[in-house]
Amino acid sequence: MTTYQVRLINKKRAIDITIPVDENTTILDAAEQQDIELPFSCQSGSCSSCVAKVVEGEVDQSEQVFLDEEQMAKGFIVLCVSYPRSDCTIRTHQEPYLV
């Protein structure tokens, strides 16, 4: 199993932490295991509570059903069903910016 380094950032919330995330673990689950509090609700990829934005790197969020193609093209992801596919940097708490 491959483990990636995922950097979670948000200047407004003073978040800048890098955590190890196994390829078969969602980024949200890994953050919870590290006692990092991130917003979430459904945990099934069908709402916008845990929306984040990929700054760098690649994730697999093929299980999500909420975001449209345009939003995904802009880098938006839902953390509850996002699995890292490379080392990456992710901006958290992005629900207010989802248009």
UniProtKB/Swiss-Prot annotation:
Question: What InterPro entries is this protein classified in?
Answer: 2Fe-2S_ferredoxin-like_sf, 2Fe-2S_ferredoxin-type, 2Fe2S_fd_BS, Beta-grasp_dom_sf, Fd_pln
Indicate yes or no for the key word Cell membrane: no
This entry's comment on the bound cofactor is: Binds 1 [2Fe-2S] cluster.
Q: Which residues form a coiled coil?
A: none
DNA-binding among keywords: no
Indicate which residues the UniProt annotation says bind [2Fe-2S] cluster.
C42, C47, C50, C80
GO terms (molecular function) for this protein are: 2 iron, 2 sulfur cluster binding; electron transfer activity; metal ion binding
- Tell me one Pfam family matched here: Fer2
Cofactor(s) it depends on: [2Fe-2S] cluster
Keyword list (alphabetical) reads: 2Fe-2S, Electron transport, Iron, Iron-sulfur, Metal-binding, Nitrogen fixation, Transport
- Superkingdom: Bacteria
Q: Its GO biological process terms?
A: electron transport chain; nitrogen fixation
**SUPFAM superfamilies attached to this UniProt entry:** 2Fe-2S ferredoxin-like
Instruction: Provide the 2Fe-2S ferredoxin-type domain boundaries.
Output: 4-96
Member of which family? Belongs to the 2Fe2S plant-type ferredoxin family.
Write out the function statement from the record.
Answer: Ferredoxins are iron-sulfur proteins that transfer electrons in a wide variety of metabolic reactions. Donates electrons to the nitrogenase 2.
Name of the protein in its database record? Ferredoxin, vegetative
Which species does this protein come from? Trichormus variabilis (strain ATCC 29413 / PCC 7937)
Gene label: fdxH2
